[in-house]
């Protein structure tokens, strides 16, 4: 009988800790990141705020999106191994959730990859274009003179 009164106080303590954790968790993202996080949730992505924050921070530091994806994939692979040892039911539920997250990560990384490719190509294009323009102008003048020679022959 003494264990019954202890149970409610124990659950109150646990719920209090959960509330503290929830409050802490909400402070992880700034306003812009929170908006992005809410958009990902609206798109049907289930991801922890802290993981989302890590991904955003890495991408802000110009870490290659593919490297971020591979690191997360490796981390998830490690979780699958540990979850399998704990129980089949939990590993099954997490196994179904992980592909969704990896698809989202690949979408995010491909979107970021396109963005970084555009940025890097825009940075490279002036160098290549100037070199290409010089080659094209000599080729075009050379080809036009050769074509005029062909027509004159």
Swiss-Prot record:
Source domain of life: Eukaryota
Coiled-coil ranges (or none): none
Name of protein: Mitotic-spindle organizing protein 2
Biased composition (Low complexity): 134-153
Subcellular localization(s) per the UniProt record: Cytoplasm, Cytoskeleton, Microtubule organizing center, Centrosome; Cytoplasm, Cytoskeleton, Spindle
Keyword Metal-binding annotated: no
GO cellular component terms attached to this protein's record: centrosome; cytoplasm; gamma-tubulin ring complex; spindle
UniProt feature, compositional bias: Polar residues: 81-99, 107-133
Disulfide bonds: none
Quaternary structure and partners: Part of the gamma-tubulin complex. Interacts with TUBG1.
Keywords attached to this entry: Cytoplasm, Cytoskeleton
Species this protein is from: Danio rerio (Zebrafish)
InterPro entries referenced in this protein's UniProt entry, alphabetically: MOZART2 (IPR024332)
């Amino acid at each position: 009988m003494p264990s019954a009164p202890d149970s409610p106080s124990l659950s109150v303590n646990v719920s209090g800790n959960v509330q503290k954790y929830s409050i802490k968790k909400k402070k992880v993202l700034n306003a812009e990141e929170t908006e992005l996080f809410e958009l990902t949730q609206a798109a049907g992505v289930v991801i922890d705020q802290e993981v989302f924050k890590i991904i955003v921070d890495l991408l802000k530091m110009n870490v290659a999106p593919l490297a971020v994806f591979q690191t997360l994939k490796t981390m998830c692979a490690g979780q699958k191994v540990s979850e399998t040892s704990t129980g089949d039911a939990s590993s099954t539920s997490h196994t179904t959730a992980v592909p969704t997250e990896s698809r989202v990560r690949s979408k995010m990384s491909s979107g970021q990859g396109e963005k970084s490719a555009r940025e890097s190509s825009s940075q490279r294009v002036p160098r290549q274009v100037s070199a290409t323009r010089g080659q094209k102008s000599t080729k075009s003048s050379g080809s036009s003179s050769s074509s005029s020679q062909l027509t004159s022959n």
